[in-house]
A protein has these predicted regions:
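TPR alpha-solenoid repeat register
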Residues: 13, 56-59, 100, 134
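Conserved structural position within tetratricopeptide repeats
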Residues: 4-5, 48-49, 85-92, 126
């Protein structure tokens, strides 16, 4: 908050405040989470406006995930249409981003686009991940494996968690 008090348009401060709010929302009850998420949405929309490429289009990616997972009206403001707009844009900007591709696969599957969802899930599952990044990316690989397991093609590529020798 102090950094943003000095510069209300600091993309880094806006983005990471939104991320922190998201983590708090995950750990709080449903009502508190819904209150935090609206403020988080505002911060992320501002990041998109100021620099949509920051953190590999992290604001687009986060907004896409929020809109996809939240219930729609009248309970909340979830919207698969908005989710698709943001995740498509994140994918256009950073097509090799594992997190974006995992979230995109999940959304596409839920929208009935199973073949396209599987394509993105396969990308995530075959992406080389350094040993030191395994824990960070495990959640996204799990999302991709879940999408893959729900598609008709029962073959699951297991190219992840390659240990690089340096």
């Amino acid at each position: 908050d102090r950094a943003l008090a000095l510069n209300a348009n600091d993309v880094r401060g806006l983005f990471w405040k939104a991320v922190a709010m998201g983590k708090i929302a995950e750990d709080s009850g449903m009502l508190n989470a819904l209150r935090l998420i609206r403020s988080m949405e505002e911060l992320l929309l501002k990041v998109v406006m100021l620099d949509e490429t920051y953190e590999n289009a992290g604001a687009h990616r986060a907004l896409g995930r929020i809109y996809h997972l939240l219930p729609g009206f009248p309970i909340s403001f979830g919207s698969n249409q908005k989710a698709l707009i943001h995740l498509q844009r994140a994918y256009e900007l950073f097509p090799k981003d594992v997190i974006t591709r995992a979230f995109y696969a999940d959304l596409l599957y839920d929208q009935g686009q199973k073949k396209e969802a599987r394509h993105h899930a396969d990308f995530v599952m075959s992406a080389p991940i350094h040993q030191e990044d395994e824990l960070e990316y495990a959640e996204y690989v799990k999302i991709a494996r879940n999408v893959a397991s729900k598609t008709n093609d029962r073959t699951v590529k297991l190219g992840n968690f390659i240990r690089f020798q340096e």
